[in-house]
Each structure stands twice: as structure tokens, then as C-alpha cells.
């Protein structure tokens, strides 16, 4: 039995072939998948897939590269969305200074909110870190 603990089944190039990708994973012995969100606009799609597929679970979070696009993201939004029974983690979140895609202070602020949400819900946090 294998578990894919970090996949992005809703990414362009994958979502168009989602049924085939899921079938291949299952045929290869993957019995569960955690579909990770990286932007708020993905949350409903990630959760929707988890509702449709019994072996797919969801996370809610904002990737550090997207921090500038989510100014004001707070713990309350994360907690509210993570109340869905198919959501089993908070993230992907963290700090990524390598590509300099988002302001460092905004990344730190968002990361803190994710940590608060993880503590409040008791859900594990998915941390992305680079440089």
C-alpha cells in the first residue's frame, strides 16, 4: 500500500487527465492521495475532488509564492474551510525566498496564520521551505 502525501491533481496539465492519473495511481497500488491546495481559488475544486473520490483527501492553504495575492488571509478563513470532513491538513504554506515571488513579510504573516489555524483545528500543517 502506498500513500501519495503531496499531489496537485488540480494543476493545469493534470486536471485535464485527472481520471487517467487517478486510475494509474490506483493500479500502481496508491490507496490514498492528499491533494494540496496552493491558492484560495483552488479550495473548492480540491475539496470537490475529495468529495467525489473516496481515496482522495484535501488540504487548504496558500503557497508562499502566492502570499502577495492573498494579503489579509487569516486564520478564520482557513479554520472555516478546514471544517469540511474531507480536509485533513492545513497548507501548503511556509517560506520561499529563493525565487522572490512574494514579499518576505507577507510570507511570514501568512505562515503565522496557517500555524494558528493548524493549532486551532488540530490538523497537521504542510510546510514548504526553501532558502
Language-model segments: what does each one mean?
Residues 1-131:
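Mid-domain alpha/beta scaffold segments of enzyme catalytic cores
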Amino acid at each position: 500500500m502506498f500513500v501519495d502525501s503531496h499531489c496537485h491533481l488540480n494543476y493545469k496539465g493534470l486536471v485535464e487527465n485527472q481520471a487517467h492519473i487517478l486510475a494509474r495511481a490506483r493500479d500502481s497500488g496508491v490507496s490514498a492521495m492528499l491533494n494540496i491546495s496552493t491558492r484560495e481559488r483552488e479550495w473548492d475544486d480540491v475539496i470537490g475532488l475529495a468529495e467525489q473520490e473516496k481515496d482522495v483527501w484535501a488540504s487548504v492553504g496558500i503557497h508562499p509564492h502566492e502570499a502577495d495575492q492573498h494579503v489579509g488571509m487569516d486564520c478564520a478563513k482557513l479554520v472555516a474551510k478546514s471544517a469540511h470532513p474531507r480536509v485533513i491538513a492545513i497548507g501548503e504554506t511556509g517560506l520561499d525566498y529563493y525565487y522572490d515571488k512574494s514579499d518576505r513579510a507577507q510570507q511570514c504573516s501568512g505562515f503565522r496564520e496557517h500555524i494558528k489555524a493548524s493549532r486551532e483545528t488540530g490538523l497537521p500543517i504542510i510546510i514548504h521551505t526553501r532558502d
